[in-house]
Amino acid sequence: MASQGTKRSYEQMETGGERQNATEIRASVGRMVSGIGRFYIQMCTELKLSDYEGRLIQNSITIERMVLSAFDERRNRYLEEHPSAGKDPKKTGGPIYRRRDGKWVRELILYDKEEIRRIWRQANNGEDATAGLTHLMIWHSNLNDATYQRTRALVRTGMDPRMCSLMQGSTLPRRSGAAGAAIKGVGTMVMELIRMIKRGINDRNFWRGENGRRTRIAYERMCNILKGKFQTAAQRAMMDQVRESRNPGNAEIEDLIFLARSALILRGSVAHKSCLPACVYGLAVASGYDFEREGYSLVGIDPFRLLQNSQVFSLIRPNENPAHKSQLVWMACHSAAFEDLRVSSFIRGTRVVPRGQLSTRGVQIASNENMEAMDSNTLELRSRYWAIRTRSGGNTNQQRASAGQISVQPTFSVQRNLPFERATIMAAFTGNTEGRTSDMRTEIIRMMESARPEDVSFQGRGVFELSDEKATNPIVPSFDMNNEGSYFFGDNAEEYDN
């Protein structure tokens, strides 16, 4: 872990920059999102989309996926070497929805990847603009986090499905760089490491030879990223043990699962960024807004401001509730899938309900769904207040929570107590305290037991009026202390399937 002095802020990671001051960071993040906006406008022109069609979130997602696919070098190389039936490795595409005679129709489009890369580079002053691509990946990841529950993935790696609050960023592609690593939850990192260890157990040659050396370096790097997320010395010491293991196996998997559980109370630092769909940046650029001159931040008021003045539409299936669809997208935009619903509701200004009570499926429409009865509605993405996104897990103390999700991972830096259900979590910690990590385990369990439910996190931090862009008057909300609020509570959300 780099020492405190060399930590880069998210915006620096986001823009691949070295150390910059606040103004330079705002300018480079502004440059990044205006590049996305210019690209989107150009794609709408190419596809001859009307203004309304260009504001359709499903069209935005298709266009975003096309550019991500065009720049996915590893997959492109793989497709060239393993030609599969009916897949042209040089082309990319997806469904574009158009309004015809009062109905929505789906049209499948196909483009040369080379052409998409050219348009993207042209919109980004001739550069590859990797930061912008990562930004789109994070928006897709945040949307997945709000839409799906990763129960099956958790169970497959031997973790408890109720640990879903640790799974932020679990669908991020491997190539998402430092900005991607910053937003990954503790559970996501643990899952990646367990998968790796399991491969090593099953495949004798996994850690051997030239390839094995590279694998080992990747393993240690992932261990260090996870170590950097923990805030207590004992958790970090355990990570050192896992990293230094000569031949990672079941003992390491046990340690990692132990650490993941401990993170429900001794929460890790996980970054949160408001990444918006490309069409939102496109709308702003088209209306003459100069992101680079004005500067932009993913963790301050700017995304809230942008959403206050953007009209985005979504296709709605016959029995879906448009207000619920809006909530889903609002949560995705602010990376708030694992935030306490009490906090989200206060900021949004309307009640944010648990996933199981939403009458809506995912945003994307499957290719076999019937378009006949599809309608479209405006998404309500505005908020009553804004708050600063956090990169810490809040201080480590908790309270009772629900059956579906037994902890939260805060998104907004706002004073509250952090709900968790001690009995449920501590029940998992009986027994195994022997072995080489016994003293650390004992220490971690002791810290967890002394965490007090009522303790307040983010002391004195509040939300701000949308007119208060300099964050001068914090409004500290008061919450009902006994009323926990986790989103995946007792839930039946769909599974995420690749």
Swiss-Prot record:
| Pfam families assigned to the protein according to its UniProt record, in alphabetical order | Flu_NP
Assigned GO CC terms: helical viral capsid; host cell; host cell nucleus; ribonucleoprotein complex; viral nucleocapsid
Q: What is its main location?
A: virion
Q: Where is this region: Disordered?
A: 1-21
Where would I look for the motif Bipartite nuclear localization signal in this sequence?
198-216
Q: Is Transmembrane found in the keyword set?
A: no
Q: What exactly does this protein do? A: Encapsidates the negative strand viral RNA, protecting it from nucleases. The encapsidated genomic RNA is termed the ribonucleoprotein (RNP) and serves as template for transcription and replication. The RNP needs to be localized in the host nucleus to start an infectious cycle, but is too large to diffuse through the nuclear pore complex. NP comprises at least 2 nuclear localization signals that are responsible for the active RNP import into the nucleus through cellular importin alpha/beta pathway.
Q: How does it assemble?
A: Homomultimerizes to form the nucleocapsid. May bind host exportin-1/XPO1. Binds to viral genomic RNA. Protein-RNA contacts are mediated by a combination of electrostatic interactions between positively charged residues and the phosphate backbone and planar interactions between aromatic side chains and bases.
UniProt-recorded name of the protein: Nucleoprotein
Gene name of the encoded protein: NP
